[in-house]
Amino acid sequence: TYKLEEKNEKNGYRAVFEMTVKDGKITESKYDNINADGKSKTEDTKYEESMKAKSGVGPKEYIKQLNDSFVKAQSASGVEVVTGATHSSESFQNYAQQLIQAAQAGNTDTIEIDNGATLKDGTYSLKEKNDSNGYHTTFSMTVKDGKVTESNYDNVNADGKSKKDDTEYESKMKDVAGVGPKEYIETLNKEFVKAMGEEDGSPAGVEVVTGATHSTHSFINYAQQLVNAAEKGDTTEIVVDNIVTK
């Protein structure tokens, strides 16, 4: 059983998350938001009503949906984003990914997220271990004076060449989606630095790039993980053993 918890409450709640692995499979996902008394947000009828009125869904529904989706998908990236609860879904995916990484390493220490802490200066980096369609993600983020000053997200092949320079891929994707890696990779890096410069800035503030929705969600997921590392000041490179299904 692998556990993760946020240390700090936001709007009266913090996330707690427990994942059980049996015979190499995720058999149970218990993600929740609890208050200081340990009461679940799913039981907060007032919150449920006001959120439902605004976005058509409340914690009672989306928390269960996310847990079910995770067990079904057996991966963080496969979790369906719940309409009306995009931010919660992205946060869930980030934490699910961190639990999977802990499980791959067999590390059952509770992961503590110092959410909202001032970012510590340094360079934080993450990379995927496996190529998918010939490319894997590399991502580094620089923090100076508590602010994100630089974002270097890229997709590179085995020779370290960027997807941005793959003219064939660029023209193919542009035809289909109206945008290619040359554009969206740069846009995501720029948007991230901008989003983090806002008051209470977070990766969730990154706008989805039309035509590159999947890449945007993956970017936000990894950006959140780098921000969590910076909140703690942990500059160890994060290696994501992204499971590439054949």
Task: Say what each PLM segment does.
Residues 5-119, 127-246:
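Active-site- and interface-proximal helix/loop "cap" or "latch" segments in soluble metabolic
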Residues 1-2, 124:
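A short tyrosine-centered beta-strand micro-motif
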